[in-house]
Design a protein with these regions (language model features):
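Helix-rich "cap/lid" substructures immediately adjacent to catalytic or cofactor-binding pockets
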Residues: 1-58, 138
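Generic hydrophobic secondary-structure packing signal
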Residues: 32-35, 62, 75, 82
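A short acidic, glycine/proline-enriched capping/turn motif at secondary-structure boundaries
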Residues: 39, 64-65, 89, 109
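Structural motif
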Residues: 57-60, 128
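Glycine-rich nucleophile elbow surrounding the catalytic serine of serine-hydrolase chemistry
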Residues: 60-68, 73
Length: 223
């Protein structure tokens, strides 16, 4: 059964919580999904996005859950339940402060590869997000992240931004979280999609039968 108290608490956190609380992944994940879904439903209710008028949906990382709610593939309640489990498992995979993420702006592939190679001497680090040409995000252990931040100039990185997150998402350090999520996600019956869904993992259209495994893979895969 859906926990209404949980939603009420998250709603208060969204509007009145401080940055530190909202940066913790067990808070930010359900909060972002709830906010995204509220915006989507407002657009539909105001007929700015008529129901059934869109042919495809996609969501980046956590946004894939909002996209699934939007296309009818999963109910809002089930999405919140999965994100409660997903976010806790992600945080439990590494203690707060031991891992993180860093965005690199305006870098060519050889510069990124060299940064990863250099930083890996201080800890595990992985390519996590390929957002656009010249904008990627790395995930890893905090010593490796800090190495890049402190040595950005000598590594020829135009701009490095440490992200305000509490864990290193979308990399092998989240393997435990993927295993925990797999147990719970296999209990979900996904509905027939109202619109095509494009997967973060494959960048291709996926089906109701494929989405469960793709959501599990997404936890440890580049998106």
């Amino acid at each position: 059964k859906f926990d209404l108290f949980y939603l009420y608490w998250k709603g208060n956190l969204i509007f009145y919580g401080n940055e530190s609380e909202l940066s913790e992944t067990q808070n930010s994940q359900p909060a972002i999904m709830a906010t995204s879904t509220a915006i989507f439903r407002a657009l539909v209710s105001e007929n700015l996005l008529p129901e059934g008028s869109f042919q495809a949906v996609a969501g980046h990382s956590l946004g894939e859950y909002s996209a699934l709610v939007a296309n009818g593939g999963i109910g809002f309640n089930d999405s919140v339940r999965l994100l409660k489990i997903r976010s806790k498992a992600m945080q439990d995979s590494m203690p707060v402060g031991t891992g993180g993420m860093i965005a690199l702006i305006g870098c060519e592939k050889d510069i990124i590869d060299n940064a990863i190679k250099s930083a890996s001497q201080d800890g595990k680090i992985y390519l996590a997000n390929d957002n656009a040409d010249g904008q990627i995000v790395l995930s890893g252990e905090i010593n490796a992240i800090d190495f890049i931040l402190q040595n950005a100039k000598s590594l020829n990185i135009r701009r490095a931004i440490k992200l305000p997150v509490s864990a290193p998402f979308h990399c092998e350090l989240m393997r435990h979280a993927a295993q925990v999520l797999q147990v719970e996600i296999n209990k979900i019956n996904f509905n027939k999609f109202d619109a095509d869904l494009y997967s973060n993992v494959t960048s291709m259209k996926c089906t109701e039968n494929e989405i469960a495994q793709l959501l599990i893979d997404q936890v440890v895969s580049i998106v």
